[in-house]
UniProtKB/Swiss-Prot annotation:
The gene is Akr1b1. It comes from Rattus norvegicus. GO terms for molecular function: aldose reductase (NADPH) activity; all-trans-retinol dehydrogenase (NADP+) activity; allyl-alcohol dehydrogenase activity; cis-1,2-dihydro-1,2-dihydroxynaphthalene dehydrogenase activity; glyceraldehyde oxidoreductase activity; glycerol dehydrogenase (NADP+) activity; L-glucuronate reductase activity; prostaglandin H2 endoperoxidase reductase activity. This is Aldo-keto reductase family 1 member B1. It is found in: Cytoplasm. The modification N6-acetyllysine is found at residues 95, 222, 263. NADP(+) binds at residues 10-19, 211-273. The modification Phosphoserine is found at residue 3. Keywords: Acetylation, Cytoplasm, Lipid metabolism, NADP, Oxidoreductase, Phosphoprotein. One of its GO terms (cellular component) is perinuclear region of cytoplasm. The active site is at 49 (proton donor).
Length: 316
């Protein structure tokens, strides 16, 4: 299987990256340094993770040590929902670049299709606990994203958590300059996303799978939630290949021609998660893993369920 996938702008994106969502600032610098030393070249970041400065420290250290050159790294970040207004997009991108200590990003994504009221709160809520929307349209936000490419701040642009109807609106935008290169979505055996992936691939859009292990460290986990890592059926498949459950869960999207970004701050796990290119799941095991779909989401963003651009109402 390819260790890179080609984006629609001709650049190559490593199929395995290090996720940094929920990585504590005190641990993420070391995690990124360890990952780069082990061979990771793709790091997935976002302003809302509130740890980009610490990621930047690690990147600078490895660049200074000449462990890697900048052109060998593939750095992704995301525009947060409170910055969807066209006038705010460039400033948000520049803040990320400054925190990461970089001149450009390889890929910049609209993190969610939902625009939020601008201000200091990442999740501005009303008295009922619903998010306060902004008067913005992600199609207009996309125009500002395109300008970032023209100005050399980012090499490629894409989306995250968008459904096919929302992507279609961007593709049909009058005067579209750049198609989305990537759609980053939650994807694992309990949420296989077959229709959405088929749609994206059909449009030449690469799909990145986040939370491939089911995000066991999510703060809102409930005891009764299903656990991918503890699923005896997946453990059984892993034993057959002499691999860990995590390695099977990371290999699964790679064989579906997806990019995958498991998160860890533990050096042993960061290493384990990278050892997925020396085995191949059989067609039968791939089909079995796909059959475990139950449309179960780690990241349902329920506080936005009433937002006009909430992406998960329609199974389209």
């Amino acid at each position: 299987m390819a260790s890179h996938l080609e984006l629609n702008n001709g650049t190559k994106m490593p199929t395995l990256g290090l996720g940094t969502w929920k990585s504590p600032p005190g641990q993420v610098t070391e995690a990124v340094k360890v990952a780069i030393d082990m061979g990771y070249r793709h790091i997935d970041c976002a302003q809302v993770y509130q740890n980009e400065k610490e990621v930047g420290v690690a990147l600078q250290e490895k660049l200074k040590e000449q462990v890697v050159k900048r052109q060998d790294l593939f750095i992704v970040s995301k525009l947060w929902c409170t910055f969807h207004d066209q006038s705010m997009v460039k400033g948000a991108c520049q803040k990320t670049l400054s925190d990461l200590q970089l001149d450009y990003l390889d890929l910049y994504l609209i993190h969610w299709p939902t625009g939020f009221k601008p201000g200091p709160d990442y999740f501005p809520l009303d008295a009922s606990g619903n998010v306060i929307p902004s008067d913005t349209d992600f199609v207009d936000t996309w125009t500002a994203m395109e300008q970032l490419v023209d100005e050399g701040l980012v090499k490629a642009i894409g989306v995250s958590n968008f459904n096919p109807l929302q992507i279609e609106r961007i593709l049909n935008k009058p005067g579209l300059k750049y198609k989305p290169a990537v759609n980053q979505i939650e994807c694992h055996p309990y949420l296989t996303q077959e229709k959405l992936i088929e749609y994206c691939h059909c449009k030449g859009i690469v799909v990145t799978a986040y939370s491939p292990l089911g995000s066991p460290d999510r703060p809102w986990a409930k005891p009764e939630d299903p656990s991918l890592l503890e699923d005896p059926r997946i453990k059984e498949i892993a034993a057959k290949y002499n691999k860990t459950t995590a390695q099977v869960l990371i290999r699964f999207p790679i064989q579906r021609n997806l990019v995958v970004i498991p998160k860890s701050v533990t050096p042993a796990r960061i290493a384990e998660n990278f050892k997925v290119f020396d085995f191949e799941l059989s067609n039968e095991d791939m089909a079995t893993l796909l059959s475990y779909n139950r449309n179960w989401r780690v990241c349902a963003l329920m506080s936005c369920a009433k937002h006009k651009d909430y992406p998960f109402h329609a199974e389209v």
